[in-house]
Design a protein with these regions (language model features):
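Short, small/polar residue-rich loop motifs at catalytic or cofactor-binding pockets
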Residues: 90-92, 196-197
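Glyoxalase I/VOC metalloenzyme domain signal
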Residues: 1-83, 98-153, 161-221
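Short beta-strand micro-motifs in enzyme catalytic cores
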Residues: 91-95, 155-157
Length: 221
């Protein structure tokens, strides 16, 4: 397990930005523009090594099954790989894809039937971190000023989003997250993601890196 490090005791109050580290920034920019999520993330060129499951997913919540299909289709057309075809479940309707840069995206709706045509509207974006100990990580984050919005024991925690944040932050057990996404739990190297906060840099006990956000306002990458 990666030991937590801290550069300051100053506390972030919410996740303000998400930066994906990619090998080919121009290719990634084209993909995310075509996928329709480019305004929700930032991109940074990086050659750091990463194999297997990176320990997180970005999840889109949309209005209905037709919109899930639309986003999955756009991702595949732009070069994504389907990990789980879009299908009904006990919780609604969802599909999982892996972007060409390796980031896993889940597109879901709680609705099992459409009440209108497909749109390109996103209701919510959630960054779900797969961690070894949800309670311990929750404590680290609350100690640094994040506010818990929902919590289900040691299984799941969701933090309150800032007014300017395009992405909500949540914690889930790493093994359970990998199972939900349809991938093996094993993975080594960098997570290839940097979380922007409102305080100084630190790295949590699962190796997720936070840095001070230059600006809380989201801008297209």
């Amino acid at each position: 397990m990666v030991m937590a490090t801290t550069a300051s005791t100053a506390a972030p109050t919410s996740l303000s930005s998400v930066t994906l580290e990619v090998a080919d920034i121009e290719a990634a920019r084209r993909f995310y523009t075509a996928f329709g999520v480019d305004t929700h993330i930032h991109l940074r060129a990086s050659g750091t090594q990463s194999t297997g499951f990176r320990g997180f997913t970005l999840a889109l919540t949309v209005a209905g099954p037709a919109t899930v299909d639309s986003f999955v289709g756009a991702a595949v057309d732009a070069g994504a790989t389907v990990l789980k075809p879009a299908a009904k479940s006990l919780w609604g309707y969802s599909g999982v894809v892996r972007a060409p840069d390796g980031t896993i995206w889940k597109i879901a709706t709680s609705a099992k039937k459409d009440t209108g045509p497909a749109t390109r509207e996103i209701g919510e974006v959630v960054l779900l971190l797969g961690v070894e100990d949800v309670k311990a990580t929750k404590q680290v984050y609350t100690d640094r000023g994040l506010t818990v919005a929902k919590s289900f024991g040691g299984k799941y925690t969701e933090f309150a989003a800032g007014q300017s944040s395009p992405v909500k932050l949540a914690l889930y057990k790493r093994r359970a997250l990998a199972k939900d996404l349809g991938v093996p739990v094993d993975g080594t190297g960098s997570h290839r993601i940097v979380l922007g906060g409102t305080a100084d840099a630190f790295t949590d006990q699962d190796g997720f890196v936070w840095e001070a956000a230059a600006s809380p306002a989201p801008t297209p990458s």
